[in-house]
């Protein structure tokens, strides 16, 4: 009998890739979205899923209609554009807690959570995410929890408001200059397919995991933001043609409290049999080639 996965954030970047991968693996998919959600990433998959609009339907309806075996929670609010703290907390903490309550009430087997490797007090987003993890740990005697802490993922179909797609969009427009920070920050850039594989790997090994498991999801190899952006520009010049855009590193200050190095320890994920398939160069080639054909 097919296992059923309830997926939140299915219309988003990560969620859309997870949705397609889980369907290919033969899982039954239930998704939570809003009536106003933009479904362009998953339009071709909508006929294969059961969908609930949580802004007009009770959240628990998905659980009373379906036997939910697993929840994969990718919905989040990044807190860009000067959003109110209450809006960020509503999505990242309160909405998440309502899903967790339903999981416990209806005996869902496992809650897969999407966390961040950012430090708790860096910003409102990271604080709200870490507060929810504390509740997950508190409730792990009632439901099995798998917490996946993601580093800087990238890939086709991400929002242009995010750093990597924004840089590519500026290069594609051949703007005169791009103002950046020093670029000395070290980050572990991981391609979206490798992130999805991490979720699938933990799902396939779920019986061997304890009541609360955490995994750092990164390649284990850090490079500077400056080096990464230069690689983006080099690949863009090959794909889009000669580019005269000047990269102005140091033109804007780093964010207050920003970590200069994010430590990724993916040992436990490697022990499950996971390993990244894409180098930075391979991932960027796929991403920028996609941007060439995108309208």
What residue spans do the PLM features occupy?
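N-terminal Rossmann NAD(P)H-binding glycine-rich loop of SDR-like oxidoreductase domains
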Residues: 5-25
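N-terminal Rossmann-fold cofactor-binding loop
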Residues: 32-36
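NAD(P)H-binding glycine-rich loop region in Rossmannoid oxidoreductase-like domains
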Residues: 52-91
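Conserved Rossmann-fold NAD(P)-dependent oxidoreductase catalytic core, especially the SDR/UDP-sugar
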Residues: 73, 90, 94-130, 146
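Active-site beta-alpha turn of Rossmann-fold NAD(P)-dependent dehydrogenases/reductases
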Residues: 75, 112-116, 149-151, 184, ...
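Short-chain dehydrogenase/reductase
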Residues: 89-93, 122-133, 158-165, 188-189
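Conserved beta-loop-beta element that borders a ligand/cofactor-binding pocket
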Residues: 115, 134-156
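C-terminal substrate-binding subdomain of Rossmann-fold SDR/epimerase-dehydratase oxidoreductases
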Residues: 172-295
């Amino acid at each position: 009998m097919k296992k059923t996965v309830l997926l939140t954030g299915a219309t988003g970047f990560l969620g859309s890739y997870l949705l397609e991968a889980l369907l290919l693996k033969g899982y039954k998919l239930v998704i939570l979205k809003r009536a106003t959600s933009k479904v362009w990433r998953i339009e071709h998959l909508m006929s294969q899923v059961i969908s609930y609009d949580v802004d007009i339907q009770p959240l628990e309806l998905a659980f009373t209609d379906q036997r939910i075996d697993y929840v994969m929670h990718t919905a989040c609010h990044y807190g860009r554009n000067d959003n109110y703290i209450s809006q960020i907390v509503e999505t990242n903490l309160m909405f998440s807690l309502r899903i967790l309550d339903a999981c416990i009430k209806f005996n869902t087997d496992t809650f897969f959570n999407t966390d961040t490797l950012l430090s708790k007090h860096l910003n409102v987003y990271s604080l709200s995410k870490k507060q929810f993890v504390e509740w997950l740990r508190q409730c792990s005697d009632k439901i099995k929890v798998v917490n996946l802490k993601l580093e800087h993922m990238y890939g086709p179909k991400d929002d242009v408001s995010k750093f990597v797609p924004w840089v590519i969009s500026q290069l594609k427009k051949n703007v005169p200059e791009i103002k950046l920070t020093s670029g000395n920050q070290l980050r572990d850039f991981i391609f979206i397919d490798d992130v999805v594989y991490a979720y699938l790997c933990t799902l396939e090994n779920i019986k061997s995991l304890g009541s609360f498991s955490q995994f750092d999801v990164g390649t284990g190899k850090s490079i500077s933001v400056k080096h990464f952006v230069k690689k983006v520009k080099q690949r863009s010049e090959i794909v889009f043609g000669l580019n005269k855009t000047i990269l102005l590193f140091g033109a804007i200050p780093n964010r207050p409290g920003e970590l200069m190095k994010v430590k990724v320890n993916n040992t436990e994920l490697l022990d499950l049999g996971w390993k990244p398939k894409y180098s930075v160069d391979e991932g960027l080639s796929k991403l920028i080639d996609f941007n060439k054909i995108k309208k």
